Amino acid sequence: METNVKGEKDKELELNEVTMILDVAAGVIEKVRTGEITHITTVLNDDNQNQILENADGALLLTIEELPDTYHGCYLYNGGEFPYAIKGSLEYLVLNDGEGQSLTKIIGVGMEPVKRFRFQGPDEPSVEDPEGDSCIWEIQFEVAPVLEEPRHYLMRWNPSVSSFKEEDYQACLEDMNHGMFRLNWSISEWQEARRGDVFYMLRSGDEKAGIVFSGMFISDPYPADDWAGTTKRRMYVDMVCMNAAAPDEEPFIPLEKLQKAIPAFEWAKGHSGVLLPDSVWQQLSELWEY
């Protein structure tokens, strides 16, 4: 499957096996954009199994040690434990409501058996059975909108003073889901921030200073208690974090390189969650892609 969908401003995203197109009802796209809808569900079947599940030339890969006596295709119940692997390359859903399309980023996947039946062999009719060895699996994609014109923010992290320590970062990397982990983070210039905006995380305060991961906001800003323990309130955003450098590795873009390539911006000092000017984030994105 190949499609071109508008992503960042004036940029065509060429998507093939990393995306899947799903038809949705009218109004769903707008509700995904606002966050009223966060999950898109579909049932696993013979038509979409190769798009959703890891497979080798169409043969589904099972994640269980004990194989069933008969072939169930994508309908194996396995005691209610999902026996397949979600395709690691599947990153996006394109939502189609009949009038337009919208690109969304997959940020989580859930699976649930919704109807059980008894497998009677190839070419034999299936019989619905609450104790059956087969089932229809519902796949729940958690998504966030990929905006055509996202704003770009610089978040800052100093492990020596932050409540988020280096060991917390390591734990996040060891517990990633679908290649991502989640954080909430304070944002100083929050007034224009919205769900779907892009961020870069700048580590500071030590010899590993530089951009260490990127991601997107999956909430609008909201108030909460100060992470530093003061009585004042701060604004925060929820984020999914991707493309992360290990704590013992060099940052993807060292601070010295940032300062040399984009000297007009103050990288070494400042608050977390500052809105980057267009000229700055465009240069930064070129460094990131390079």
Where are these regions (language model features)?
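Compositionally biased, charged N-terminal/linker segments
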Residues: 2-88, 97, 118-123, 127-195, ...
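Aromatic- and Lys/Arg-enriched surface recognition patch
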Residues: 82-146, 212, 216-280, 289-290
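Short, charged beta-turn/beta-strand-edge "cap" motif at the junction between a beta-strand
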Residues: 98-100, 203-208
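Short, flexible loop/turn elements at secondary-structure junctions
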Residues: 159, 203-205, 219-221
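Eukaryotic short linear interaction motifs
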Residues: 162-164, 208, 223-225
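Polybasic, glycine- and aromatic-enriched phosphate-binding surface used to engage nucleic acids
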Residues: 189-204, 223
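His/acidic/aromatic-lined binding-pocket segments of jelly-roll/cupin-type domains
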Residues: 191, 209, 215
